[in-house]
Each structure stands twice: as C-alpha cells, then as structure tokens.
C-alpha cells in the first residue's frame, strides 16, 4: 500500500537503525545506552543510523529538550547519517496513510462519545471482561465524516502476533488481547503508535532497538505494518537500568542526565565504555575502544536482565581515560570545566601540564579543575586543617630559608626547585617534610598537591614567592 516514498534510501544498505527519543526532557543514561546499542549495531553491519525526534506530545515537547538531546548525542559522538527528523513535520504524510487505510477498510471512523465509552468500560469490568472497544462504529454509516470522530485501526481478531526479539527470543501475543487502536485523535492529530509505524516504514528501518517498556507496543505496530504490506523490522528490547539498590534508576541515585555527567567531569569515552558494558560484554574485558565496540557488538550478547548502575565503576573508567587519552584531548574537556567554574586559565600553566600532574590524583575533570585553582588564581584563605597542622611558628624559618633559595635560582624549573627544597632541608638539618609541607600549604592553600617541584615550576616564581610571604605573615599574625 506504500505511497510515494519520501526518503531517498540507499538500496545497498542492509541495516538501518534509529534512535527516536521524545523531547520531553533531557537525554538520560537509559536512552543514551539504547542509542549507543542502536548506533553500534548499525556500524557493526556497515549500516546507517537515523535520529528521529518523536515530538507528537505537543504539550510536553519543548525545543530546549530537543536541543539537549542533540547536544547529548553529539557529546557522546554518536553521529547519525539521516535526521534529525521531526514527527510534527510529517503530519500530512501520516494523514495520507490513514485516509488510504479508511478507503481500503483497514481503519474506520469512530463517533462514540466519552460517555458511551465509559459505560462500555464499566459494563465490561462488571462482567470481569478485559476492557476493549466493541467495534460499535465499524459498520455504522449513519454519521457524516464532518462530525467529531477518532480513527481506529481494525486490528485482526483471530490468531497471534509472533516475533523473534533479538534480545528476548520468541514473543507471542494473542490478537484477542489487543484493541482497535486509535490512530487519529478527534483534533486530527495522529497518535504515537501510528506515527512510529509510518516512520519506520518510510525510513527503511531494519532493526528497532529500544527499551523493554515498549514491548507492549510492538504487536500493535506489527499488525499495522502487516496491514500496510510493509516489511517488519527486527525488534530488540533492552532491559532497564536500575540503581545499585535494585530500584529503577532515578535522580536519587545521582545524575541520570547525560549532560550532567559532562558537567560532573566525566569524559564521553568513559561514559560510553561504561554504558556499553551495562548489559553487554565480551568475556572479562572491561576497557573497549570505539573500534573494538563496533567490531564486537552483537544484539544476541545483550543481557535480558536489568543492569545496576555503579558510579564507582564509572569513576574507575574515567580515571583510566584521563590517564590514557592524549593530554591535549583531555585538556580540551578540562577547559570546559574551568570555563563553567569561572576560572580564568590565561595566566598559568598549560592545561596539558595540569592533566599530566593531576590525572592520577583525580576521579573526574571537575575534581581536577577544582583542586587546581591555585595554579591560576589567588586563594583568600588556607585550608583550616592543613594550616593548623603545618603553618605553625616552627615553619617560619624553613619558609624564609626556602624562599631565599628559590629567589636565587637562575633557572625556574622542576629540577631547580627540587634542589632548593632539598638544600634547605640539609642546611636546617631537618627532613624534607619539614620544609615541603609548610611550603605546600603556603603555595597551594591546601595539604595535598602534586609533587612540590612540578607544582612550584607550574605556578611560577612571582606567585610562589608572594604566597610564601603571605603564609609567613599569616603565621606571625596568629602568634601575635
């Protein structure tokens, strides 16, 4: 029954998948994993990936949510060959198909009032029958098409819908369980389940990867596709993601928005690697490059069971990628964190140096940015615990002595500053810690930092000397 095709599809493409979010909120991690699985399956089979925005819920859909979804997909580097397509721009197409279905007896107008449908439902419930439409209007020709009505799909009454789910195996639903679905509302707008069918048909979708919450929609959609004479895609319904307490993942478990993970300082490679393993695996392997994911991914290896989100595992992966990815790439993502925090990095070390110094010490880029402010801007106060422990009267002499050594350096680098600290300790006949720890608190404001030689070299001579003076003044003011 296909009308003129609206898309110029490459006949040589044998696999075409889609990700079809509703723009009623952000891109959450469950949706991101679905998109990733769909994308990987297409890439594995040298196919195409379509992005479709299912925005038929006019009251809840927003341009901001659409922008957030696209931003999330781009951040995860899940590029699409086609789209984004918007269902609200295809209403003419949907109604063309509905009108032709009415002409061919595949669908019919229903003029039943809300009151009649309520009475029918109460009657069926009283008789312990499953509530369903009784086809009162199927052969009723007493109404004018101009009267308010919905359009219902004429669902088969006999037999079953059987499909082989790529994740869950064979699923069978009796047609007696299915109603005559409304496919066009009284206001003339097509309904979600119908739009999805026409889109998958028009866009040549061969494999539909989506959440298990869509399983009940599948038999209805298959029946409509069969009525249209359209090919049936392979369906794959992936399990839900739970929190580590076994409950459905929600905000109380922490971040659920993809872009919140960006904001919290995770690299996209870490989140993608984590999500791919959240329901799929290849032996005991934990770390996967993008190329390995594409080469190894198959829907048959996706678990039917719900997965538990573990933030500690994600942090472990994030640390791995912060260490292993090129420093300039990590630095580009780190730069976003500094901008978001309002930290001006113009006067300070190269961000690649920050990555080299702090990648081993930080779980996230956010933590890295927050713990490295002292490289770029002055601090007002010292960490209270660190100052109480190390900025005491006994620290004045080591600080004054090391300042003399540092001031006299002809070359300011990690090697020279290390020698200055070492020589100060030797001159005072004390351990390195008696010099290094007060110096660390003096120049960073905190009790923890990378090794002092690289820290001093990165902060710069002028700032270091001024901060030592500030620490000495702080100690003397306390003692006064």
UniProtKB/Swiss-Prot annotation:
Entry binding sites for Zn(2+): 110, 112, 137, 139
InterPro entries documented for this protein: aa-tRNA-synth_I_cd-bd (IPR045462), aa-tRNA-synth_I_codon-bd_sub2 (IPR020751), aa-tRNA-synth_I_CS (IPR001412), aa_tRNA-synth_I_cd-bd_sf (IPR008925), Glu-tRNA-ligase_bac/mito (IPR004527), Glu/Gln-tRNA-synth (IPR000924), Glu/Gln-tRNA-synth_Ib_cat-dom (IPR020058), GluQ/Sye (IPR049940)
Catalytic activity: tRNA(Glu) + L-glutamate + ATP = L-glutamyl-tRNA(Glu) + AMP + diphosphate
GO cellular component terms, A-Z: cytosol
Compartment(s) of residence: Cytoplasm
Entry keywords, A to Z: Aminoacyl-tRNA synthetase, ATP-binding, Cytoplasm, Ligase, Metal-binding, Nucleotide-binding, Protein biosynthesis, Zinc
Function: Catalyzes the attachment of glutamate to tRNA(Glu) in a two-step reaction: glutamate is first activated by ATP to form Glu-AMP and then transferred to the acceptor end of tRNA(Glu).
Protein name: Glutamate--tRNA ligase
């Amino acid at each position: 029954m296909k009308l003129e095709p609206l898309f110029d599809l490459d006949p040589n493409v044998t696999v075409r998948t889609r990700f079809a979010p509703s723009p009623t909120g952000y891109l959450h991690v469950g949706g991101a994993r679905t998109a990733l699985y769909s994308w990987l399956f297409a890439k594995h089979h040298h196919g195409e990936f379509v992005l479709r925005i299912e925005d038929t819920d006019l009251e809840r859909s927003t341009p901001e949510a659409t922008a957030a979804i696209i931003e999330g997909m781009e951040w995860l580097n899940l590029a699409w060959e086609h789209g984004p397509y918007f269902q609200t721009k295809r209403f003419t197409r949907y109604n063309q198909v509905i009108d032709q279905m009415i002409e061919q007896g595949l669908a019919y107008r229903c003029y039943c009032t809300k009151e009649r449908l309520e009475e029918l439902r109460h009657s069926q419930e009283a008789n312990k029958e499953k509530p369903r439409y009784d086809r009162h209007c199927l052969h009723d020709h007493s109404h004018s098409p101009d009267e308010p009505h919905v359009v219902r799909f004429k669902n088969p009454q006999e037999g079953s819908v059987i499909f082989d789910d790529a994740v869950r195996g064979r699923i069978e639903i009796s047609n007696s369980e299915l109603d005559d679905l409304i496919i066009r509302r009284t206001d003339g707008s097509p309904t979600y389940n119908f739009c999805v069918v026409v889109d998958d048909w028009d866009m040549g979708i061969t494999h539909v990867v989506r959440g298990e919450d869509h399983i009940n929609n599948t038999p209805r959609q298959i029946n409509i596709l069969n009525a249209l004479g359209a090919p049936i895609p392979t369906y794959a319904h992936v399990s839900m993601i739970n929190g580590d307490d076994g409950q459905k993942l929600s905000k109380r478990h922490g971040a659920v928005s993809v872009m919140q993970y960006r904001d919290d300082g995770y690299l996209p490679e870490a989140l993608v690697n984590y999500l791919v393993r959240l329901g799929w695996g290849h032996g005991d392997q934990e770390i996967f490059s993008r190329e390995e994911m594409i080469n190894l991914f198959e829907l048959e290896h996706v678990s039917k069971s719900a997965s538990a989100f573990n933030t500690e595992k994600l942090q472990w992966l994030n640390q791995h990628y912060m260490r292993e990815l090129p420093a300039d790439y990590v630095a580009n993502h780190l730069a976003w964190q500094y901008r978001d925090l309002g930290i001006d990095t113009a006067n300070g070390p190269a961000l690649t140096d920050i990555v080299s110094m702090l990648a081993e010490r930080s779980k996230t880029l956010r933590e890295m940015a927050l713990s490295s402010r002292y490289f770029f801007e002055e601090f007002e106060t010292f960490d209270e615990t660190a100052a109480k422990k190390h900025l005491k009267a006994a620290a004045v002499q080591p600080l004054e002595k090391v300042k003399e050594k540092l001031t006299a350096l002809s070359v300011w680098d990690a090697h020279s500053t290390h020698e200055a600290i070492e020589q100060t300790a030797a001159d005072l006949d004390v351990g390195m810690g008696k010099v290094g720890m007060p110096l660390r608190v003096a120049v960073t404001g905190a009790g923890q930092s990378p090794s002092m030689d690289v820290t001093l070299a990165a902060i710069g001579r002028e700032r270091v000397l001024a901060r030592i003076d500030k620490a000495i003044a702080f100690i003397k003011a306390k003692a006064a």
